[in-house]
């Protein structure tokens, strides 16, 4: 079940299932390398580009109303500047049918939301045809 984590992740608020995610497919892609979580957060803090007040509430409202707008990850900017293949992967996913493509957490795993699991499987095959078999990938139904 979905939850909202706040603080340093220690405050967990269970949420009702989101209408926007019902029946969607999810593709996870790990490109074969990791990103240091402490480094990612330090780079974000140094940039000063974080902490959009009300953003989480707006995303929860959109998802509950059946919309996917507003999904974002502020850690993408510093991580993408160092690991330049990640924005290429994100763009590929968006250009090949993902409803939403984002980095998960501090990276390096990327994810794509699709209309259904079959679309996620097709996108997975296209990804591996284009980028090869390095890393791992998985699909699930939401």
Task: Describe each region flagged by the PLM.
Residues 5:
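Conserved active-site beta-strand element of glycosyltransferases/polysaccharide synthases
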Residues 8-100, 115-121, 125-131, 135-142:
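Conserved, helical-rich catalytic subdomain that frames metal- and/or nucleotide-binding sites
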Residues 108:
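Glycine-rich GHKL/ HATPase_c ATP-binding element in histidine kinases
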Residues 111-113:
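Short hydrophobic/aromatic beta-strand micro-patches
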């Amino acid at each position: 079940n979905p939850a909202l984590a706040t603080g340093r992740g220690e405050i967990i608020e269970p949420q009702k299932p989101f209408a926007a995610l019902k029946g969607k497919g999810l593709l996870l892609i790990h490109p074969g390398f990791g990103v240091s979580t402490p480094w990612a957060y330090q780079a974000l803090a140094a940039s000063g580009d974080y902490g959009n007040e009300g953003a989480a509430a707006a995303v929860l409202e959109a998802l509950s109303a059946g919309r996917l707008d507003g999904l974002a990850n502020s850690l993408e900017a510093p991580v993408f500047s160092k690991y330049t293949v990640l924005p290429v992967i994100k763009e590929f996913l968006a250009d090949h049918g993902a409803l939403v493509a984002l980095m998960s957490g501090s990276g390096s795993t990327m994810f794509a939301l699709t209309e259904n699991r079959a679309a996620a499987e097709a996108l997975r095959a296209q990804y591996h045809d284009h980028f090869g078999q390095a890393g791992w990938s998985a699909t699930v139904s939401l």
